[in-house]
């Protein structure tokens, strides 16, 4: 059996005095695409944030390469790319400036690489346009352009297809599947029905761990 990149051990999450899930056991390995599903309020986004080290569990733990997540923050920063439900960009900056700033936090990127990433998500010609002038879909593409840079192996994505048109959805599906087929790991939530899934695709319904 392939050693897991991410693993949860008896994981529990409580929000607003309500236990969302309990005793959650997951093993996520290289090559996997794992879709977290479940009804509204089941804790999908909370689970992603726990896996990304952005929240502390009520009980249990998350392991990265066999070691507790909290003990290896620098390792997590090198290995993780997190994109939340919001675009997470600064409106007053241009797409190029946003990506330069975001990449500088972890792995600085050259200008040519940033422009190529923006072109890959259909934003050629918008590199120097302030993001407040872009549509919601274009702003989402700025955030997703990080996936086309020299990115880490673990991607955790909350509703990545939000505000994308049909072409953008198809392109992103292909890119996510390709990342997994090259040995990466993708964990995501989405209300979109995926049409391009790698061999390592799994759907995990949090309703099975509801309390």
From Swiss-Prot:
InterPro entries assigned to the protein according to its UniProt record, in alphabetical order: AAA+_ATPase, ABC_transporter-like_ATP-bd, ABC_transporter-like_CS, ABC_transptr_haem_export_CcmA, P-loop_NTPase
Superkingdom field: Bacteria
SMART domains attached to this UniProt entry: AAA
Sequence similarity: Belongs to the ABC transporter superfamily. CcmA exporter (TC 3.A.1.107) family.
Keywords noted in UniProt: ATP-binding, Cell inner membrane, Cell membrane, Cytochrome c-type biogenesis, Membrane, Nucleotide-binding, Translocase, Transport
Membrane topology annotation: Peripheral membrane protein
Binding, ATP: 38-45
Localization terms from the record: Cell inner membrane
GO molecular function, one term: ABC-type heme transporter activity
Protein name: Cytochrome c biogenesis ATP-binding export protein CcmA
EC number: 7.6.2.5
Pfam families: ABC_tran
The reaction(s) this protein catalyses: heme b(in) + ATP + H2O = heme b(out) + ADP + phosphate + H(+)
All copies of domain ABC transporter, residue ranges: 6-211
Purpose: Part of the ABC transporter complex CcmAB involved in the biogenesis of c-type cytochromes; once thought to export heme, this seems not to be the case, but its exact role is uncertain. Responsible for energy coupling to the transport system.
GO BP term (any one): cytochrome complex assembly
Subunit structure comment from the entry: The complex is composed of two ATP-binding proteins (CcmA) and two transmembrane proteins (CcmB).
């Amino acid at each position: 059996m392939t050693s897991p990149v991410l693993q949860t051990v008896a994981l529990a999450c409580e929000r607003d005095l309500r236990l969302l899930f309990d005793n959650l056991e997951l093993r996520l390995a290289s090559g996997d695409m794992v879709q977290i599903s479940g009804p509204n309020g089941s804790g999908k986004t909370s689970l992603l944030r726990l896996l990304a080290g952005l929240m502390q569990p009520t009980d249990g733990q998350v392991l990265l390469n066999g070691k507790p997540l909290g003990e290896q923050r620098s390792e997590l920063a090198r290995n993780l790319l997190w994109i939340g439900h919001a675009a997470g960009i600064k409106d007053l900056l241009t797409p190029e400036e946003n990506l330069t700033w975001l990449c500088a936090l972890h792995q600085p990127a050259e200008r040519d690489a940033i422009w190529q990433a923006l072109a890959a998500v259909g934003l050629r010609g918008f590199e120097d346009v302030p993001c407040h002038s872009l549509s919601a879909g274009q702003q989402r593409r700025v955030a997703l352009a990080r996936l086309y840079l020299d990115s880490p192996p673990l991607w955790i994505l909350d509703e990545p297809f939000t505000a994308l048109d049909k072409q953008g959805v198809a392109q992103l599906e292909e890119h996510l599947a390709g990342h997994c087929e090259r040995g990466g790991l993708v964990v995501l939530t989405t209300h979109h029905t995926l049409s391009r899934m790698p061999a390592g695709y799994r759907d995990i319904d949090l309703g099975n761990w509801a309390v």
